[in-house]
Amino acid sequence: MSPISQKGEAVCLSVRVQPRSSKSGVAGMYGEQLKICLKSAPVDNAANKECCELLAKALGVPRSSVSVMKGASSRSKVLKVEGVTPAAVREALVGMLGDEAEAGA
């Protein structure tokens, strides 16, 4: 199963976040989820904001196009990305992660 799915016009991305990491970035796959490390602590929505900003930058979409659909207070989240196709998200992930992303896609 892939961490990428489509819901209407938007793409949904299943992620697992690790707050309070030494650096922020996409770290690879965590089972069927994309693992994202964040410097921010999970306080006052800071980690969710950083997660959306990081993913928007990685996918080349505006920050307003990425939002938390499920799991706002959990490490496992579903992010909604508007204005991009599942194929474009998959291509961006393969560019960041290489073979590991292809195995999960």
Swiss-Prot record:
InterPro entries: DUF167, YggU-like_sf
Superkingdom per UniProt: Bacteria
Listed SMART domains: DUF167 (SM01152)
One Pfam assignment: DUF167
GO cellular component terms listed in the entry, alphabetical order: cytoplasm
Disulfide bonds: none
PANTHER family, sorted: UPF0235 PROTEIN C15ORF40
Family the UniProt entry places it in: Belongs to the UPF0235 family.
Identification of the protein by name: UPF0235 protein CT1832
Source organism per UniProt: Chlorobaculum tepidum (strain ATCC 49652 / DSM 12025 / NBRC 103806 / TLS) (Chlorobium tepidum)
